[in-house]
Regions:
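Charged, low-complexity interaction regions
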Residues: 43-53, 66-75
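Exported/periplasmic cell-wall-interacting domains
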Residues: 258-411
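Loop/turn positions that initiate beta-strands
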Residues: 148, 178-183, 332-335
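LysM (lysin motif) carbohydrate-binding repeats in extracellular/periplasmic proteins that recognize
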Residues: 146-176, 219-221
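Primarily a LysM-type cell-wall glycan-binding module
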Residues: 123-159
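Intrinsically disordered, low-complexity
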Residues: 94-99, 105-115, 121-129, 170-172, ...
Length: 411
């Protein structure tokens, strides 16, 4: 059975003289492999400082760090990484943030692996489908960040994916947006141009839509969640299928190709990972009919990968989102996986466009082409008199940030 835990995003081997401090003992670590090795030897870090800006971003995505459940605490220029489950770790040293003899360069803040969610954020609440048949749902909002937030923290809190919030907020520091920074929460969406039943996953959008069957005299609703999809070379299949099985507390049996891939990166996997916090597919999974059940909708123990192309072909979800969806879904629920990078809609006499990065047959992402945009706009406008703002349309295409914009008006 193919199952697809998030793929670690790893930095290149970096320059020497970076110090990994473990129980007060310096240890040189010049690559992710060495860091993973240190973890596998049961070292637990007081703190770590790196001179390479991207390095902590890389380890935040690594399987080893996710399994150890590191959190950022403190407000030092180099934030503290503390292994919370290790009772042997005593009080934080006074010099935390700048290892003795190490670098004092600023370091990106690492994403917290679990975020306490209070209430039901608007992006996760069921949304009534417009009575007039319009495909436009939801609304955009703006919030002010707190000093300890990362964009990944905010994304998870508001039902967004990582890439979604990053592209919607260009110029905002991913790891340290700062106190009071205005953050756009893109909640206004154009529904995918397919039948509104069951589960629909739009791969370029990294988003799942669930259309529950309404009871008699009940207003139809949609519930939408961010998802991770297949990475470059391991694309998620397209087409129609159904949920053929639901499994709670699953074990993970990685295929030989997945094990070979991890081994080549110095991250060997066992043949079986049982249920629990170390299981990369989480506490629930729903098997799809593709390829004899080879693909699944499952959870993750690396939530920062949600909303990105990061799996071996499956659909990954935040644990709390999958738990909610799992309770709503029955075996036999139809599932449609589509590749629609550009969505259009008419609303109040204006032509709206929502553009995302296109995904090719191999899972590679790129800006959608002008021809794709022109075809979609032509199809939408052919039965109406409309003035298209082409410069605006091209700008929206180039940004491909998923934020709805007006590109035309009726005349």
């Amino acid at each position: 059975m193919l199952c697809c835990a998030p793929v670690s995003i790893r930095a290149q081997v970096i320059t020497p003289a970076q110090i990994f401090v473990v129980h007060g003992t310096p240890r040189d670590c010049t690559s992710i492999t060495q860091l993973d090795s240190a973890l596998s030897d049961n070292y637990q870090p007081f703190f770590a400082g790196w001179s390479e800006q991207d390095y902590v971003e890389a380890i935040a995505w690594s399987r080893a760090c996710a399994n150890f459940g590191w959190h950022v605490t403190g407000r030092s220029r180099i934030p503290l990484l503390q292994a919370q489950h290790d009772k042997a770790i005593g009080p934080v040293p006074a010099h935390v943030g700048t290892p003795a003899g190490g670098t004092s360069n600023p370091m990106p803040m690492r994403v917290s692996p679990d975020i306490a969610l209070s209430g039901e954020p608007p992006s996760r609440a069921p949304l009534k489908l417009p009575a007039d048949g319009s495909p436009v749902i939801g609304s955009d909002t703006t919030i002010a960040s707190h000093y300890q937030d990362t964009l990944f923290d905010i994304a998870r809190r508001y039902g967004l994916g990582g890439e979604e919030i990053i592209r919607a907020n260009p110029g905002v520091d991913i790891w340290l947006p700062g106190e009071g920074t205005r953050i756009l929460i893109p909640g206004r969406r154009i529904l995918p141009p397919v039948s509104r039943e069951g589960i629909v996953v739009n791969l370029p959008e990294h988003r799942l839509y669930y259309f529950p069957k309404p009871a008699k005299n009940e207003t139809p609703v949609v519930i939408t969640y961010p998802v991770s999809v297949g990475k470059d070379g391991d694309s998620t299949p397209l087409g129609q299928t159904r949920i053929i099985a639901k499994i709670q507390h699953p074990s993970w049996v990685p295929t030989q190709s997945i094990r070979d891939d991890h081994a080549a990166r110095g991250d060997p996997l066992p043949r079986l990972i049982g249920p629990g916090p170390d299981n990369p597919i989480g506490d629930y999974k729903m098997r799809l009919g593709f390829g004899g059940g080879m693909y699944e909708i499952h959870g993750t123990n690396a939530p920062a990968t949600v909303g990105m192309a990061a799996t071996y072909g499956c659909i990954g979800m935040y644990p709390e989102d999958l738990a909610a969806l799992y309770a709503l879904i029955s075996i036999g629920t139809p599932v449609r996986l589509i590749n629609v990078p550009i969505k259009v809609a008419w609303s109040a006499g204006t032509l709206l466009v929502e553009a995302h990065l296109a995904i090719d047959a191999h899972g590679r992402a790129a800006a959608p082409s002008f021809d794709q945009l022109a075809d979609v706009l032509h199809d939408s406008a052919q039965h109406a008199r409309v003035s298209i703002l082409w410069e605006r349309a091209v700008y929206v295409l180039e940004r491909a940030d998923g934020v709805i914009a007006t590109v035309g008006k009726g005349v």
